[in-house]
Each structure stands twice: as C-alpha cells, then as structure tokens.
Amino acid sequence: MSSKAKLEEIPITVDFSGGLEMLFDNQRRHSISLPAKDTEGKPVTIAFLIDYICKKLMKDPRTDLFVLDNHIRPGILVLINDADWELEGEEAYEIQPNDNILFVSTLHGG
C-alpha cells in the first residue's frame, strides 16, 4: 500500500525569490507533494503546479502579482532543476519526483 501511495503523489520543492516569497507567507522554500495525475488522469505539469500554488500555497490575495490570465506573469523567471523552463517545455513540462521549481521575480519597483 505504501508503494502505491508513493506512485499517487510526487514530492517536489518549490522556491520563490526576488520578492515573490511575500505572496507565500514570506516563506522561500516549500516542500510539497502533488498528485501524480490531474483530474483528467494525465501527468501533472507546470500549468497544474501554477494553479495548485495559487489555490493551496498563496496566502496573499494579490494573485495578479504571480499570474496573469492563468499564466505566469511576464517578468517572472522559472527554473526547473536549474534550467530555464523554456528549454523544458514551459507549462507543458511534466513534473518528476524530486524536481526543484524556482520562481524568481525580475520586476523591481523604483
């Protein structure tokens, strides 16, 4: 039973930097377990993670500082295991066990 439970969840680490951590209760690192499949039975992707983060992790009501039209806001750099997400397929990337996903805001007030 425990091995089946492991197959049903994917442990990952999500980090926020560049000011984004303020949206997440000032916590930079989050160790979370995602369901292995989405509601349609497909492997979970970064798009699923973004929705999950907004619904489950974000404490601040200003979701527009993180997402815009259900996509990561321009000016936020996303790294998947230290590689630019553009090299990994962006929102279509299928999350793997023990992935490290880093969101960094490159937007700064002046």
Swiss-Prot record:
Keyword vocabulary terms for this entry: Cytoplasm, Isopeptide bond, Metal-binding, tRNA processing, Ubl conjugation pathway, Zinc
Residue positions where 1-thioglycine is found in the record: 110
Cross-referenced Gene3D superfamilies: 3.10.20.30
Gene Ontology terms for molecular function: metal ion binding
Cross-link Glycyl lysine isopeptide (Gly-Lys) (interchain with K-? in acceptor proteins) placement: 110
InterPro entries cross-referenced by the UniProt entry: Beta-grasp_dom_sf (IPR012675), Mopterin_synth/thiamin_S_b (IPR016155), Urm1 (IPR015221)
GO cellular component labels: cytosol
Single GO biological process annotation from the record: tRNA wobble uridine modification
Intrachain disulfide bonds: none
Superkingdom of origin organism: Eukaryota
CDD domains: Ubl_Urm1
Oligomeric form and interacting partners: Homodimer; homodimerization may provide an autoprotection to the highly active C-terminal residue before attacking its substrates. Forms a conjugate with the target protein AHP1.
Function text: Acts as a sulfur carrier required for 2-thiolation of mcm(5)S(2)U at tRNA wobble positions of cytosolic tRNA(Lys), tRNA(Glu) and tRNA(Gln). Serves as sulfur donor in tRNA 2-thiolation reaction by being thiocarboxylated (-COSH) at its C-terminus by the MOCS3 homolog UBA4. The sulfur is then transferred to tRNA to form 2-thiolation of mcm(5)S(2)U. Prior mcm(5) tRNA modification by the elongator complex is required for 2-thiolation. Also acts as a ubiquitin-like protein (UBL) that is covalently conjugated via an isopeptide bond to lysine residues of target proteins such as AHP1.
The name this protein goes by in its record: Ubiquitin-related modifier 1
Organism expressing this protein natively: Chaetomium thermophilum (strain DSM 1495 / CBS 144.50 / IMI 039719) (Thermochaetoides thermophila)
Origin organism lineage: Eukaryota, Fungi, Dikarya, Ascomycota, Pezizomycotina
